[in-house]
Amino acid sequence: IAGQKDIALTLHLMKYKANSNAPEVDHPRYEIRNINYLSNDSDRIHLRHQVLLNATALREGRPYSAAALQRTYNNFARLQAVKYTNISFSEVPDSNQVTENGMERDSISRQMDCNIQISTNKPSTIAFQPEGTNTAGDLGAAASLTYTNRNLFRGSEQLSIELRGAYEAITGLEGYQDQNYTEYSVEGKLVFPRFLAPFLSRNFRRRQTANSELSASWNLQNRPEFHRRVFSTAWRYRWTEPRHHLAWRFDLLDLNYVYMPWISETFKRDYLDNAENRNAILRYNYEDLFIMKMGFGLSYSDGVDAVRVNVESSGNLLSGVSKAFGFKVNSQGQRT
């Protein structure tokens, strides 16, 4: 039949029979008696017990829930230290129950035990990645060495440290003593698979699929035109709501310090001090800067439509502090 049609659907749920000779009774609602954590790798699981509890949406003494089972799988999949998880249930054998008048009667057990088997990843890995570069005909090479620990404090915290070096032979520059570009950087990142913040209840932390991230980096660039040093550090939160296709990011604090120890006189004369080429944006990029910002981001994606919103505030808090302490203002209007 072409087109859309509405139909009425009626579901008749037959009562439960243990066997062909047993009477029909209401379907029992099973409760979880015990939750057991088992290791597939060794005698013990290399995760703190509280971490296991926070990742388990199933609860002892509560009815079985398919939604809670799926959330438990999802929560363990988020942990970088966990390789895979298998959850099985075993029904508690039928037992005698005591009625109100003290008589014993046989009844169908409504309890089952939950067994969560966990296999963990190797905690530490080292990766080396070489690169070849070609920037407008200038050939170069780069290499990075990354160390990762996926279970730093036995809570699936992930620590990564990356060392990187790059070299490029620059051609076609006139009036500069050095014709090579070198860059060295080190970056460290520590990710906690939970909210790290005061005044949050335990139930709130267990419900949220959040990450807390601390990062710091140092970058050294030596170009024929200038030398630049950049230090950055940030503390941010990320969490998701899969049912609503939402992802959130909150940058609580993001600090960036840019230091220019040396600028070539040729570069100053041709670009920064030349009246024809001089502009505020160009000069701003080659000054010593200290930037503090906060930011909030929201993204939505359902596989068809995608929306992203970002809001940032930079310098307001730092400006207020400098005014409160009476920092001096230089000729360019900057507080020092």
What kind of region is each of these model predictions?
Residues 127-134, 140-196, 213-215:
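Predominantly transmembrane beta-strands of Gram-negative outer membrane beta-barrel pores used
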